[in-house]
Amino acid sequence: MDIATFTFNPFSENTYVLYDETKDCIIVDPGCYTEEEQTQLTDFIAQHALVPVHLVNTHCHIDHVLGNKFVSDRYGLSLTSHAGEQVVLDAQPTVSQMYGISYLRSPDIKTFLAQDDILTFGNTSLKVLFTPGHSPASISLYNHESMQLIAGDVLFDGSIGRTDLPGGDFKTLIDSIKTQLLRLDDKVVVYSGHGEITTIGKERRSNPFLT
């Protein structure tokens, strides 16, 4: 599985395009905010002759959903996420006003993912891990074959997700990381919602919130 990373919007959010040799792809957490950012995303997809088959949110905070409507309209995709994130998604028009940023309302979640579900595209299978704490129903996507993890805002290089937003809970987040993510192999590469990639092994050894 190949992963293309785009850092978008005023929150420096990481948007991911996951694809394989079949050219099918999924777009995870599209944060594209400006026309230039939208063009960066669509140009990459066109240049690589990719076919988007899923639009997925790990969670529905504003920085991760700013491009949902654009991607949904452009590629005819419905939204896939955990059912528990709909309440978060519903709050984002108000959140966008609080931050003073424009927001085209995302479509509602139509396809629901839960713990141990398998999301497929092309020849690739992703296992869904339920990882709440940063948000009430955040999910992570794990590819066992390629040892890659899309973690949203659950785990970062040297840090963890904030828990002071509505629906956040520190104990729940730590429990999610320890029971879901730290069970994975040390070599698993972690792609977070912000910042650089890391590995499970590095975070197990040196993350100050986990040691």
Regions found by a protein language model. Name each.
Residues F6, L18, D116-G122:
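Short acidic-hydrophobic surface loop/beta-edge motif
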Residues Y16, T111, D116-D117, I139, ...:
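Residue-level detector of beta-strand structural context in well-folded domains
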Residues F6-T7, D108-K110, F130-P132:
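Short Gly/Pro-enriched turn/cap motifs at secondary-structure boundaries
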Residues C32-Y33, L50, V95, T124-T211:
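Metallo-beta-lactamase
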Residues M1-H48, S140-A151:
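Conserved beta-strand hairpin/beta-sheet module of binuclear metal-dependent hydrolase folds
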Residues Y33-T120, R205-F209:
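Active-site HxH/HxHxD metal-binding segment of metal-dependent hydrolases
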Residues I27-D29, H54-N57, V128-F130:
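Short catalytic-loop micro-motif centered on adjacent basic/acidic residues
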